[in-house]
């Protein structure tokens, strides 16, 4: 479940798990170093998660075989067919707002990376995932000014731990209408249907037109009868409260309708309401199911990139949207004059103590698409702390994905089923209870808590592709299904990863040319170095007959000036390293992505684990303020 977003400070120093965890860290780090991440495989698993979350009558050709049909009478008692759609997370409520956001993000991935998905033979599966959501939205939109936006109640649902196939909790449905408006969820559903319409247009024109019809009607409903959805729907407020209000969703829906139709009335809407609705005023450091401003600003920047001078009459406003988009991007890249997204010591963006990975995935998506926009226009991102090339933006986005897949201080994949070391006690009812095909007897409401929720056994069903909430602000993770803030996956967290995986899977392999120092650069030696290195071994152990060491290197700035650029040569390194960022040149490293300067007297901490002798570290090049 989602909650309000709390900010948590981070530090630039690396923290390593206790000695008891070091062998696991070593094994995982070695596998990370030995081979590149399989983004295509991760993409495949990401789509499996959406299959596992399906509600309703499941198709015979489904790939997730441990799931069965469920909730086959949703809405019937209230005279409407609401069978289908997706369960939100580890429970069985169908929350309309995050579900619609997830479909929007899946569709945006297709819009941007259709070719990559076709080349990787994944497009049909992504479109199937989108259609499972849009079919439900079309059914839920029963009148022009009415939309069913929730099935199930979070409070009663959470009192039971049972499989979807055994559900005994009330399946009450809730709707918004002219007397009980909900502009956020109506606007987001309009955005989802418009984005999906564009994704389907080349392949199913009639279906695309149907989605557009519903999208336009829902946008008009959201805009004409304005009101916060969680004022009308108290049962959603506890779980998905609207902190940002509904104005971002109105702009977001209009932007997607313009993207899908090219109809100028929607571009006029986002231009005329830009200031009043906060589109050109909000400078944010998060993008989520609640706050759409960063996504809106990036999407409208695309219009400027594509149309340039032909967007006459709107160009000035679009440039204001773009300025706010670039504020967000520079904040992610740690180049925003101190107004940056917080980072964990291991290099993960950290926005919230609750389900932080959803912000990582959405930010990685925006960084990835914007990098491509810039590359196609031969532009660069100009941040307060320096210019950033498209390839560097993509590299940072990839660093976040790599962290997710295992390049992190715990050496753990936070995507279930990816790699050999991943969460096995996920906060998810279906994953934690044996499948109905393995154990046909009904699991009762409280029986599920006694036998499975509190069990120390690993999940009997692997929830392939689920992106859990992730580690805390210090890169620590407790693999415990009671730890719902960190161990629960969500639709909103997974959806943006689809497009990012498609893009990264299609990228060419990295080249690692030999580094050639600049003509006046210092030679690779410690003579005259601006840094004083202190190298210590803080732990040692034996694994598989090999002695391993945990090395900690502190590099103190002794030159008397702030260092704004640093290039290190690290030779004879065989293990994973933390605290510096690898460059494309062999054996060359620079400041970590979350660090832009090292003040006089300050220390940079580098940690690595390997067998045999210590690595050799030397300063190759540096600049001072």
UniProtKB/Swiss-Prot annotation:
Pfam families according to UniProt: CBM49, Glyco_hydro_9
GO biological-process terms attached to the record: cellulose catabolic process
Entry keyword Glycoprotein: yes
Domain of life: Eukaryota
Glycan-linked positions: 440
Catalytic activity: Endohydrolysis of (1->4)-beta-D-glucosidic linkages in cellulose, lichenin and cereal beta-D-glucans
Signal peptide range: 1-34
SUPFAM superfamilies found in the cross-reference section: Six-hairpin glycosidases
EC number: 3.2.1.4
GO CC, alphabetical: extracellular region
Keywords: Carbohydrate metabolism, Cellulose degradation, Glycoprotein, Glycosidase, Hydrolase, Polysaccharide degradation, Secreted, Signal
Location of the active site: 91 (nucleophile), 427, 479, 488
UniProt keyword Coiled coil present: no
Region feature Disordered, mapped onto this chain: 509-530
Protein family (similarity comment): Belongs to the glycosyl hydrolase 9 (cellulase E) family.
PANTHER family in alphabetical order: ENDO-1,4-BETA-GLUCANASE
Protein name: Endoglucanase 13
Organism this protein belongs to: Oryza sativa subsp. indica (Rice)
Lineage of source species: Eukaryota, Viridiplantae, Streptophyta, Embryophyta, Tracheophyta
